[in-house]
């Protein structure tokens, strides 16, 4: 596949019109009927701006072309495969954009009787996510997966406090865990202790038995883990954790690999957080805000964030407050627009479709492994084990023998028209390439990706110096990362840029 990205010398939108010409569009006067109804709005003087907003004076056409050009220098799943491991960058059907539009004309403070349809949707999602995860109840109040994770850790802390177990001050975290796991635990005031993996990439059971004690508050784990391996000892892990009156916490980042096939609740987990922007078709990052869910079973449902939707006398009400709730994690009721996306996604799939997601994502990963298995420079921990949603290769041999790193391989993939996989994660794998193809990619796409990776390995052995110059087909080549991130040069906003140009900022603190 021949691919070359567009390259525009595109200025910032604030700097597009340097002539100073006024290209402002049509100003529409207030409607007379509205004016007579509300009169003039009386805004306190201390809230009024001293000067008008510093907006560029541009025509509609200039604005459209500006953003189209920027989009041509970007890359997303609508352009090609994005195999970012542990990110689940699946294609999100466009029909779901229509679903989220139903929330745009409503306000979170609107009367509940006016938004019965939205509340019914949230109510159904609460039940669906509880069923999918094997939990008893679910709260959608959290605005994102990481916020749901933090809420889950707060639930563990409050639960132990209510049971006079303040001595439980340590949270166990798998060494393959996402960075948010130890971060959430530390934010909640816990000491963090890592549980090492064994030679097969699974939780080392001997180490786990040795370190679990009365001070253990919980164990944060993904299953499948971040190597794409299913923790086959999960039931025994559950027994060990519960024997210490600790909580088994499920990070839902990797749920896609077992979706509709295995449920965390049946594995012995007590609390689950979900990333709707991974598993349930909500766009990532620049595509829009994330969305989360936090689910629990048994006594722990009493600690879920509020409010939750319940059905009272045939009406849906945001009135359910668990008796020991950790409270609100954010204002209002989560990212409702994104909940609508997930609702449409699940409604379209149905139970059998949900199960196919887990099966096809697993099939895609293992097909890719089969295509790449004979390349000795792509090392695989526990090579005879099947993977679930993702796989981690090590290119340590390329680095040792030819000076080609995981970063270099990722840059070379960009030149082939593929987004780079996650690199250097998890940190227990040297020179890691973490690949998650997802269920939405075709066999043909996986074949092309595998061939591109094979060619890069051969190029690394034949002409490593040339490979180190990649990428050359992208809009921007390699960045000087130290320069870009140094406090004396990092420029995150236009305001900072202007202050730098005026010499008013030297270092960002």
From Swiss-Prot:
Its cofactor is pyridoxal 5'-phosphate. GO terms for molecular function: glycine binding; glycine dehydrogenase (decarboxylating) activity; pyridoxal phosphate binding. InterPro entries: GcvPB, GDC-P_C, GDC-P_N, GDC_P, PyrdxlP-dep_Trfase, PyrdxlP-dep_Trfase_major, PyrdxlP-dep_Trfase_small. Signal peptide: none annotated. It holds the Pfam family GcvP2_C. Keywords: Oxidoreductase, Pyridoxal phosphate. GO terms for biological process: glycine decarboxylation via glycine cleavage system. The modification N6-(pyridoxal phosphate)lysine is found at residue 278. SUPFAM superfamilies: PLP-dependent transferases (SSF53383). One of its GO terms (cellular component) is cytosol. It comes from the Archaea. Its EC number is 1.4.4.2. It catalyses: N(6)-[(R)-lipoyl]-L-lysyl-[glycine-cleavage complex H protein] + glycine + H(+) = N(6)-[(R)-S(8)-aminomethyldihydrolipoyl]-L-lysyl-[glycine-cleavage complex H protein] + CO2. Belongs to the GcvP family. C-terminal subunit subfamily. PANTHER family: GLYCINE DEHYDROGENASE (DECARBOXYLATING), MITOCHONDRIAL (PTHR11773:SF1), GLYCINE DEHYDROGENASE, DECARBOXYLATING (PTHR11773). The glycine cleavage system is composed of four proteins: P, T, L and H. In this organism, the P 'protein' is a heterodimer of two subunits. The glycine cleavage system catalyzes the degradation of glycine. The P protein binds the alpha-amino group of glycine through its pyridoxal phosphate cofactor; CO(2) is released and the remaining methylamine moiety is then transferred to the lipoamide cofactor of the H protein. This is Probable glycine dehydrogenase (decarboxylating) subunit 2. The gene is gcvPB.
């Amino acid at each position: 596949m021949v691919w070359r990205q567009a390259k525009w010398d595109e200025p910032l939108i604030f700097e597009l019109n340097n002539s100073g010409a006024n290209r402002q569009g049509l100003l529409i006067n207030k409607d007379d009927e509205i004016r007579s109804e509300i009169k003039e709005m009386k805004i306190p003087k201390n809230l009024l701006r001293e000067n008008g907003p510093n907006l560029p004076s541009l025509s509609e056409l200039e604005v459209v072309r500006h953003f189209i050009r920027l989009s041509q220098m970007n890359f997303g799943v609508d352009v090609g495969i994005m195999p970012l491991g542990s990110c689940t960058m699946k294609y999100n059907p466009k029909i779901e954009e229509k679903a989220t539009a139903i929330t745009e004309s409503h306000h979170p403070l609107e009367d509940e009787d006016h938004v019965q349809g939205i509340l019914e949707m949230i109510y159904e999602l609460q039940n669906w996510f509880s069923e999918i995860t094997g939990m008893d109840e679910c709260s959608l109040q959290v605005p994102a997966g990481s916020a749901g994770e933090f809420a889950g850790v707060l639930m563990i802390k409050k639960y132990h406090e209510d049971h006079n177990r303040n001595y439980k001050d340590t949270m166990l975290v798998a060494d393959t865990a996402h960075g948010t796991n130890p971060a959430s635990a530390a934010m909640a005031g816990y000491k963090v202790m890592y549980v090492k993996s064994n030679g097969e990439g699974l939780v080392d059971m001997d180490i786990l038995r040795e370190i679990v004690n009365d001070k253990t508050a919980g164990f944060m784990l993904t299953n499948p883990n971040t190597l794409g391996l299913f923790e086959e000892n999960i039931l025994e892990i559950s027994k060990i954790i519960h024997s210490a009156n600790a909580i088994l916490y499920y990070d839902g980042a990797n749920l896609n690999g077992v979706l509709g096939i295995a449920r965390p609740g049946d594995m012995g987990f007590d609390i689950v957080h979900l990333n709707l922007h991974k598993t349930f078709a909500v766009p990532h990052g620049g595509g829009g805000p994330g969305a989360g869910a936090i689910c629990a079973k048994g006594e722990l449902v009493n600690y879920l964030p509020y409010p939750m939707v319940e059905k009272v006398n045939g009406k849906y009400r945001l009135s359910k407050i668990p008796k020991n709730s950790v409270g609100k994690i954010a204002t209002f009721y989560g990212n409702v627009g994104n909940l609508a996306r997930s609702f449409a996604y699940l409604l379209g799939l149905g139970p059998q479709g949900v199960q196919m997601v887990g099966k096809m994502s697993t099939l895609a990963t293992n097909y890719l492994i089969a295509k790449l298995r004979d390349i000795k420079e792509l090392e695989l921990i526990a090579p005879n084990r099947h993977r679930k949603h993702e796989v981690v290769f090590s290119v340590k041999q390329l680095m040792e023998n030819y000076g080609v790193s995981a970063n270099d391989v990722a840059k070379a993939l960009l030149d082939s028209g593929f987004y780079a996989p996650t690199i250097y994660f998890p940190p227990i794998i040297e020179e890691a390439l973490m690949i998650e193809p997802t269920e939405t990619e075709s066999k043909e796409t996986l074949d092309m990706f595998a061939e591109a990776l094979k060619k890069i390995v051969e190029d690394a052995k034949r002409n490593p110096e040339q490979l180190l110059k990649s990428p050359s087909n992208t809009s921007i080549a390699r960045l000087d990362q130290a320069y870009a991130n140094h406090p004396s040069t990092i420029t995150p906003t236009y305001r900072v840029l202007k202050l730098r140009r005026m010499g008013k900022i030297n270092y960002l603190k």
